[in-house]
Amino acid sequence: MQKKALVTGSSRGIGAATARALAGSGWRVTINYIQSREKAEALAAELGTEAVRADVSDSAQVQAMFDAAGPFDLLVCNAGIAWSGLLTDMTYSEWRRIVDVNLGGVFNCCRAAIPHMVHEKRGCILCMSSILGVYGGSCETAYSATKGGIIAFVKGLAKELGPSGIRVNAIAPGSIDTDMLSCFTAEDKQAMADASALGRIGRPEDIAAAAVYLASDAASFVTGQILGVDGNMVI
């Protein structure tokens, strides 16, 4: 039987690349989106699967998504939002929103996915953190906090679920060429490339390849780990 995966926030960018790569590795991948319906449905048609709209910060919507398309053998928590600026310019509602999506979304999706995985005594959870979750970033304090929280979440959950045969890992991307970089100038992007030992910005496919590895049997003894895919970025 074909194994099933859910990739949240997979209508574009890293999520879409990950969905394509997993599908190419034999997974049946459910596409999740909140705003980009046309892109999500086009990707679902390309992969011969379904696209399900759900706001990951809303536990009821997440559960409805799992009821409609699940259960899943692999959960990739990719959905997330960013906020740039001085912390003193950030409102509490903006703080709550980024925490609710980036951390709350991981909690909601994991809580919905775990019962089936525990019952089957197998499963895999991957969460997208960030290099900023490791080192922090100026004018990215809230984003860094949520991505750092994901790292602690993954390490704790891996210990909790290990006895049930479930692996939990995270990927910490560096600067990746997605829509999140659209607000940066060419000079800014060059500086990001220069900060990498490899002299370039990463591609979504770089992250997707890491996800395919961590989801595969080749990583059967890998859990509780944070895989940096950043070109040895210097912060």
Please identify what each model-predicted range represents:
Residues 86-87, 94-99, 181, 192:
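Substrate-binding pocket helix/loop in short-chain dehydrogenase/reductase
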Residues 130:
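Residue(s) in the substrate-gating loop at a strand-loop-helix junction
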Residues 110, 146, 154:
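Active-site helix of classical SDR
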Residues 115, 159-163, 220:
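Alpha-helical segment proximal to the catalytic Tyr-Lys
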Residues 25-41:
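Conserved glycine-rich Rossmann-like NAD(P)H-binding loop of the short-chain dehydrogenase/reductase
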Residues 166, 200-229, 233-234:
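C-terminal substrate-recognition "lid" of short-chain dehydrogenase/reductases
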Residues 11-12:
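Conserved glycine-rich cofactor-binding loop
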